[in-house]
């Protein structure tokens, strides 16, 4: 058993390093998400203010503060690097993986099954995609996984002291989740445990000990909640009504999508384990009486999934918390299939992975060969990127083939399918995507002008955050567009941060007396710089959809 634990620990550590650590600093930051979170934490560290989030020097109330603390600490430890920007997400994903292992050991006392569950979790497409991307979803997923483990401890406790301890841990997890992403962290655990409470007849325990969790969560959140209410009295009004009610429930909710939206998303999210999905969910339902731990996991998968499906606003990242319990279900289902000599599901899984790799290879060949004249993703000079992409998906295909042979023993090799993709994807991104969604490249190419400009403006918040991050300045101004900082711009002390196109000529005449001025525009598809009604610039640089208008200082 010790040898098993040691070999699995080494395997998981190597996998984690290859997928989650090594690629981090080699990829440019995506806008708007990564540039936003990078800059918010940089400004918090610069200001020494860990209570009120700011973006571009403006109040930014879209999220509470605990998720930023992860990123703050990462930047404090590792400096102003892309690795530091993403490490908060990686750390959270790693801790969630440890919780997956711990819960598996609590349920089954089986190190192999616990290790398999951890490997399945870490190799899921949604997990490694979001777990190496700077957003707050990995942090909230960590706290929801902690809430899941805590609640399981309350079910297994046989004494009042044990139950009390479990509910205290549940309150701590929910409190930190609330401080990371708001009331969602309170709603999801409540929804997830309802079927479990009914099935196991735990209503009395919930009524007795549930208030303990609520009190602990409130006590944990209260110092910051009071501090921000004192400094910014409108925070809670905006955060509750705009960020929760409008985003999820109202007809004008952000990211509206139909009820069935998460069906195809979930199928893609669990790759390279798609064939295990139906059987694992059915197993959790069919064996709900004989094996209540499987129904426990099923409830933590399906109830949040239904909740997010009902909500009008939807994004793929929202279902990340469902992946941890789903990985545990899949591990249990797969091991039972091996024990019962049912290998068909592993053959199907290998075939699905092989088809996925092959389809992606063919898609890259078609895109690179010019067979689709109306689709210009890569230029003729970017053939090395196409080759890199083909190699990445050839790795997916290769490990699919490996896993199909003697699949009762090698089925878990499917976890290696994404390895080359994770290591190489940063080198295969088309230049037009780089110049649209990865502004660091554009900024570095034009650093001579941007770095010496007294004023820097842009019409995109994501690009503005990238400029602020690269230039280490929070006074980047918005040009004619408010975007997601519209609320912060409404404050009287922030109105000078927005320059309209009609005011720009007059403003520019005054600004050039103080120094150079740089205006960065993100052009729409098909839009040219000739369509911009701007004062004549001393220098214009265009890289696909990003354009720099540089105005030299005038006396």
From Swiss-Prot:
One of its GO terms (molecular function) is mannosyltransferase activity. It catalyses: 4-amino-4-deoxy-alpha-L-arabinopyranosyl di-trans,octa-cis-undecaprenyl phosphate + lipid IVA = lipid IIA + di-trans,octa-cis-undecaprenyl phosphate. InterPro entries: ArnT_tfrase (IPR022839), Glyco_trans_39/83 (IPR003342), LipidA_mod_glycosyltrf_83 (IPR050297). The chain crosses the membrane at residues 6-26, 87-107, 116-136, 178-198, 206-226, 257-277, 293-313, 315-335, 351-371, 384-404, 411-431. It is found in: Cell inner membrane. Catalyzes the transfer of the L-Ara4N moiety of the glycolipid undecaprenyl phosphate-alpha-L-Ara4N to lipid A. The modified arabinose is attached to lipid A and is required for resistance to polymyxin and cationic antimicrobial peptides. Belongs to the glycosyltransferase 83 family. This is Undecaprenyl phosphate-alpha-4-amino-4-deoxy-L-arabinose arabinosyl transferase.
């Amino acid at each position: 058993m010790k040898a098993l634990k040691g070999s699995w620990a080494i395997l998981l550590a190597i996998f984690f390093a290859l997928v989650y650590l090594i690629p981090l600093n080699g990829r440019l930051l995506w806008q708007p998400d990564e540039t936003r979170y990078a800059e918010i934490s940089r400004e918090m560290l610069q200001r020494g203010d860990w209570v009120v989030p700011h973006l571009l020097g403006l109040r930014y109330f879209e999220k509470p503060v605990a998720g930023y603390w992860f990123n703050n600490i990462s930047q404090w430890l590792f400096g102003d690097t892309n690795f530091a920007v993403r490490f908060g997400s990686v750390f959270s994903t790693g801790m969630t993986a440890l919780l997956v292992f711990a819960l598996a050991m609590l349920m089954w006392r089986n190190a192999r099954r616990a290790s398999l569950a951890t490997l399945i979790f870490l190799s899921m497409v949604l997990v490694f995609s979001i777990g190496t991307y700077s957003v707050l979803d990995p942090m909230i997923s960590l706290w929801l996984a902690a809430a899941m483990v805590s609640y399981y401890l309350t079910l297994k406790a046989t004494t009042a002291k044990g139950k009390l301890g479990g509910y205290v841990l549940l309150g701590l997890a929910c409190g930190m989740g609330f401080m990371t992403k708001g009331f969602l962290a309170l709603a999801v655990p409540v929804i997830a445990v309802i079927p479990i409470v009914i099935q196991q007849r735990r209503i009395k325990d919930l009524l007795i000990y549930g208030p303990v969790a609520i009190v602990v969560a409130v006590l944990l959140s209260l110092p910051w909640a009071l501090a921000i209410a004192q400094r910014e009295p409108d925070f809670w009004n905006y955060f509750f009504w705009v960020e929760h009610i409008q985003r999820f429930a109202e007809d004008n909710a952000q990211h509206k999508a139909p009820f069935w939206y998460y069906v195809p998303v979930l199928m893609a999210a669990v790759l390279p384990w798609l064939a295990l999905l139906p059987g694992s969910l059915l197993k959790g339902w069919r064996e709900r009486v004989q094996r209540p731990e499987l129904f426990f996991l099923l409830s933590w998968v399906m109830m949040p999934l239904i909740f997010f499906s009902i909500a009008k606003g939807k994004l793929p990242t929202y279902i990340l918390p469902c992946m941890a319990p789903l990985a545990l279900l899949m591990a249990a289902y797969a091991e039972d299939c091996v024990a019962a000599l049912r290998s068909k599901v592993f053959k199907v899984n290998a075939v699905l992975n092989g088809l996925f790799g092959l389809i992606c290879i063919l898609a890259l060949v078609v895109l690179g060969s010019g067979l689709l004249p109306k689709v210009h993703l890569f230029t003729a000079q970017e053939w090395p990127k196409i080759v890199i992409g083909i190699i990445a998906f050839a790795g997916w295909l290769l490990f699919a083939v490996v896993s199909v042979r003697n699949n009762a023993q090698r089925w878990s090799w499917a976890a290696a399918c994404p390895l080359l993709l994770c290591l190489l994807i940063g080198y295969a991104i088309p230049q037009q995507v780089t110049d649209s969604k990865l502004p660091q490249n554009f900024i570095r190419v034009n650093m001579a002008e941007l770095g010496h400009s007294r004023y820097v403006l842009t019409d995109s918040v994501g690009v503005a955050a990238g400029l602020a991050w690269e230039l280490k300045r929070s006074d980047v101004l918005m040009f004619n567009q408010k975007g997601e900082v519209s609320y912060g711009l409404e404050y009287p002390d922030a109105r000078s941060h927005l320059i309209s196109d009609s005011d720009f000529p007059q403003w520019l005449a005054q600004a050039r007396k103080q120094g150079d001025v740089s205006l960065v525009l993100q052009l729409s598809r098909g839009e040219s710089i000739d369509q911009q009604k701007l004062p004549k610039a001393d220098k214009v640089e265009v890289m696909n959809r990003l354009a720099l208008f540089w105005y030299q200082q005038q006396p």
